[in-house]
């Protein structure tokens, strides 16, 4: 039998304190479903790598929102650094991760 190795998903505190507060209830539910079904299962398969200056990060599209995360294959973990509307996600995340 094939055993699936699940990834652990972690959130930067700012995602909980800022990002999720501005997202509507229905969109939050869709985001949670996508995290549970895709990021915890095969984040490499369902996401795309980003280009510079966010080259070490990946994105998962959930409707009009983007989940930006760092993938740690060795430890089977995803660190979500931002969840925002597609119009402003990259500038906001750039401020958080590039210092």
Residues of each region from the PLM?
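A generic beta-sheet turn/junction motif
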Residues: 62-64, 73
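Residue-level signal for short amphipathic helical patches enriched in basic/charged
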Residues: 22-26, 42-45, 75
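Arg/Lys-rich, positively charged N-terminal/basic patches that mediate binding to nucleic acids
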Residues: 1-33
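Enriched for short, Lys/Arg-rich terminal
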Residues: 1-3, 10, 70-99
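A short, surface-exposed loop/turn module that caps and links secondary-structure elements
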Residues: 36-60
């Amino acid at each position: 039998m094939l055993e699936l190795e699940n990834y652990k998903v972690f959130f930067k505190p700012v995602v909980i304190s800022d990002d999720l507060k501005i997202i509507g209830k229905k969109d939050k539910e869709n985001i949670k479903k996508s995290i549970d079904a895709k990021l915890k299962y095969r984040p490499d398969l369902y996401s795309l790598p980003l280009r510079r200056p966010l080259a070490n990060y990946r994105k998962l599209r959930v409707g009009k929102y983007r989940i930006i995360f760092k993938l740690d294959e060795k430890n089977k973990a995803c660190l979500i650094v931002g969840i925002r509307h597609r119009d402003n996600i990259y500038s906001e995340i750039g401020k958080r991760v590039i210092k």
